[in-house]
Amino acid sequence: MRVVVWLVEGTWPACVDAVRTHAPRATEVVLLHVSEPGVPGLAHGAFAGLLGRGHAERDPGNRLEDLGARSAARLLDAAAERLGRACTRQERTGRTEREVVAAAEGADLLVVARDGDRARLGPHSLGRAGRFVVDHAPCPVLLIWPEATPAVTTIPPPPPHPPDPPHHPHHPHHPHS
């Protein structure tokens, strides 16, 4: 059984714990972290626009890329240590939700933490990326609460029922037709 675990800062410990609890016999565990290319790319562009391309050693985009890579490596190392068993560490760069779906191809299970409003039950507990991943994953998804699950009383009230359509006297199901 191949399990892919999407790791995000702040919620990754719960995802790792979910693998230990719900997939203890997994034959392969892939710890996945995805970095968005946006911030370093913006810094590269701003630097090149202001000072030209001749001073690469001073480009703040390079420093941001290095910081991001080191942070991702530390997160993956901490997750592997918490898992306490053999695993593969995978760092990808791109549109987060699409990279997660691509990494889950061929997996038997994808572990995902809720990334939206985690204070109440309901559809808003998934953010944009989480919703995309849940809707497009090519395998079963284990969707977890990274903290204590909110009480059932936090479910939003149902929308009002639409009024019944008017009955037409000549309709075939009308009792006087």
Predicted feature descriptions by range:
Residues 1-58, 136, 146, 163-177:
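Small/aliphatic-rich secondary-structure junction motif
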Residues 10-11, 80-110, 148-177:
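Structural beta-alpha unit
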Residues 17, 77, 131:
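Active-site phosphate/pyrophosphate- and oxyanion-stabilizing loops and adjacent acidic/basic residues
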Residues 22, 100-103, 133:
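Structural alpha-helical scaffold elements that stabilize or flank donor/cofactor-binding regions
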Residues 30-32, 88-92, 142-144:
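General small-molecule cofactor/ligand-binding pocket signal
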Residues 53-74, 119:
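A short acidic, glycine-rich active-site loop
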Residues 109-136, 150-152:
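Glycine-rich, Arg-bearing micro-motifs that act as flexible, cationic patches
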Residues 113-114, 141-146:
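Short beta-strand elements of ligand-binding domains
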